[in-house]
Amino acid sequence: YTSGGVANRVYEISTPYLTAELFDIKFAQSADVMYITHPNHEVEKLSRTGHTSWTLADVDFTDGPYLDNNITTTTLNPGSHTVGTGVAVVASATTGINGGSGFLATDVGRLIRFRDGYMKVTARADTTNITVEIIEDLGSATASADFALGSFSDTTGHPTCVTFFEQRLVFAGTTDQPQTLFFSKSGDYENMNENRGGTIADDDAIIYTIASNQVNAIRFMTATRTLIVGTAGGEFTVSGGGTDVAITPTNILIKKQS
């Protein structure tokens, strides 16, 4: 609120959005930070640190979210397991990767959970060969079928909407998972770690897909005493099952309202 609320000057910042995309942008704001979603773009974070100090950057999510774990015999074989860049990863087949298409150019920037750690795709040579940055030690550099591909990517689409609820940042509605909600860890908005394979804690991230008779993409979310989720086919409420019961990975209730 500078200059008595009079707009004596306009501050401009470059964005990745096209004019035709503006009406599909959704956002959630907490103080001087705003998270912005559009299905064609990575989640952006607009931060203000001063009247003329604003930054817009891709959100660098911690460990997730991910699609379901691989259930095929396809393995990934990394050239190293320790944290670092420029690591080659070879897939034994394309089965189980992008519906059998193997790695795609649109997978660059995508996270992959592998064994005990995770990595980010930095380059793609062909359908079975990629280069990655290992962000968390993988535990072993031997081939394994224990992997899961990231949910947010140019291949699968990015979230359609976003809101804050019960100290979590909530995203919803990617192209490939139009009825799915993605809750961050409690109090850690950019951490999407579900603690797969470990002991689940109440504050862990949550992925939940609304079950319905037909696919109805999530269009909006509104946080009240419950989380109201609007889809193309009706509205749902999301809660922990009671007025004062918090949502946890093992305690989440979704009810259709209309």
What is each of the regions a protein language model found here?
Residues 1-35, 100, 107, 195, ...:
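N-terminal assembly/attachment segments of tailed bacteriophage virion structural proteins
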Residues 8-12, 48, 53-147:
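Autoprocessing Asn-cyclization modules and mimics
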Residues 1-5, 36, 41-43, 51-53, ...:
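Non-transmembrane elongated oligomeric "stalk/shaft" segments that connect baseplates/barrels to distal
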Residues 39-58, 130, 178-184, 235:
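Short, surface-exposed terminal/edge motifs of secreted or surface/virion proteins that either
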Residues 24-26, 45, 120, 161, ...:
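Short, surface-exposed charged micro-motifs
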Residues 23-27, 56, 251-255:
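Generic structural motif
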Residues 17, 148-168, 173-258:
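Beta-propeller and closely related beta-pinwheel folds
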